[in-house]
Amino acid sequence: MKSVRYLIGIFAFIACYYLLPISTRLLWQPDETRYAEISREMLASGDWIVPHLLGLRYFEKPIAGYWINSIGQWLFGANNFGVRAGVIFATLLTAALVTWFTLRLWRDKRLALLATVIYLSLFIVYAIGTYAVLDPFIAFWLVAGMCSFWLAMQAQTWKGKSAGFLLLGITCGMGVMTKGFLALAVPVLSVLPWVATQKRWKDLFIYGWLAVISCVLTVLPWGLAIAQREPDFWHYFFWVEHIQRFALDDAQHRAPFWYYVPVIIAGSLPWLGLLPGALYTGWKNRKHSATVYLLSWTIMPLLFFSVAKGKLPTYILSCFAPLAMLLAHYALLAAKNNPLALRINGWINIAFGVTGIIATFVISPWGPMNTPVWQTFESYKVFCAWSIFSLWAFFGWYTLTNVEKTWSFAALCPLGLALLVGFSIPDRVMEGKHPQFFVEMTQESLQPSRYILTDSVGVAAGLAWSLQRDDIIMYRQTGELKYGLNYPDAKGRFVSGDEFANWLNQHRQEGIITLVLSVDRDEDINSLAIPPADAIVRQERLVLIQYRPK
């Protein structure tokens, strides 16, 4: 009976966090709109080999993540949930691996369930795991590789070892097809400390080549197909997307070495109070083979991405699966022997919730700011934000009422965030970051447009996905589409600011021409260097400028 209650509880937890509220959140640009449109175009064109964005070649990532996203939109439709279905599925599969691996390491069902709940309730896992980017996919393949390598090294027969290494190669191959060669570097770096401390070099050298073979065979069919269709894909993807992004001085998303320290701290909420003890206990018990293995998979990728020039919070998502297992193991030890860390965790959650309540007031219409984040007519959004932090503080307090029994309710601290964040986004944010909001407000003007031009790739992708058309033209700025626009067959998909007046004269009689521009809030649109328009509609950061045939 207790098992049934646990099962019902975990399904209710998943529904409240990962299923029910997802459709209430509009897609964010540039990331979610980009991946939504790439997958929509894949379904519309039937081309499952070469990724395209706005009808242009888009070589920033390989294909596997787009496949999963496309299946999500195929199953659930071109809606907010359909766009995010793939990442949610990947996150839940990763959680299932956490359950299985924890159970295999410690043979404790309660610990396995706790590790799963901790993983799914970690702030960074929830934030990225419900956000349509490719990182939850690569995190799944890396965690699957972590499990596969352990299976291989614990097997007692050559068949078991061979199967484990072959499976490892498949996970690495799918990782390469999802986000590139990092899927090879991270597993190698993560297993080396464990192999060294356990002196298991012999098995690695005898069977490791099987992983190499299965990895190559996994990538080969699509790798050859894309090379035949687009011979310069691999050169661009390797040099620009790997070397320049991570290693060179002009790397994208440059950040200092310590960048991930605050990410780890914030990402570990609502279990932050357990983090120091979990890492310390793991290090103290490093003679235990499983603990060393989990520590290695937590720390080595973190060090690798810290050394890299380019950094984003999403890069270290895979570190939180082994960390969740360490947190769960330490939590049960603390509950049994010394609940001080559990009390500290409760107070941290109370402090976080109270701080959020105060911060919400400061930036609300009734606070001291001259330009509040929310306007007076958005008061319901302020109350939603207050509810988010109030629930966080409440469950933090509840864990302290009988800490030995109630500490696990910290998993419910983000419940308000999950249910209400979609209703609390200020209009001023939505108008700049949610193209869907803009499209809904200007649907009648946009729909009949013969040509639509915009100066933002993220907005262009949002317009394309919402309007179900891939012929959006870039205006003034090429952004990440620069490479695709250089192809001869992309001629006419970009109009510079200097060319716009002549281009407008040439195409005006063909139908309505709509220009969608991103502007500063205090920018005077009358000062824009464009021909006089027939209609102008402004939504804070986005402006619709329309020209009708004469």
Swiss-Prot record:
Q: What is its EC number?
A: 2.4.2.43
Swiss-Prot/TrEMBL catalytic activity? 4-amino-4-deoxy-alpha-L-arabinopyranosyl di-trans,octa-cis-undecaprenyl phosphate + lipid IVA = lipid IIA + di-trans,octa-cis-undecaprenyl phosphate
- InterPro entries from the xrefs? ArnT_tfrase (IPR022839), Glyco_trans_39/83 (IPR003342), LipidA_mod_glycosyltrf_83 (IPR050297)
Name the coiled-coil region(s). none
What biological processes does GO assign it?
lipid A biosynthetic process; lipopolysaccharide biosynthetic process; protein O-linked glycosylation; response to iron(III) ion
Q: Which domain of life is it from?
A: Bacteria
Where does the chain cross the membrane?
7-27, 81-101, 111-133, 137-154, 165-185, 204-224, 255-275, 288-308, 315-335, 346-366, 382-402, 406-426
Molecular function per GO: 4-amino-4-deoxy-L-arabinose transferase activity; mannosyltransferase activity
What are the protein's UniProt keywords?
Answer: Cell inner membrane, Cell membrane, Glycosyltransferase, Lipid A biosynthesis, Lipid biosynthesis, Lipid metabolism, Lipopolysaccharide biosynthesis, Membrane, Transferase, Transmembrane, Transmembrane helix
Q: Where in the cell is it found?
A: Cell inner membrane
Family, per entry: Belongs to the glycosyltransferase 83 family.
Function recorded in the entry: Catalyzes the transfer of the L-Ara4N moiety of the glycolipid undecaprenyl phosphate-alpha-L-Ara4N to lipid A. The modified arabinose is attached to lipid A and is required for resistance to polymyxin and cationic antimicrobial peptides.
- Any idea what this protein is called? Undecaprenyl phosphate-alpha-4-amino-4-deoxy-L-arabinose arabinosyl transferase
**What's the name of its gene?**
arnT
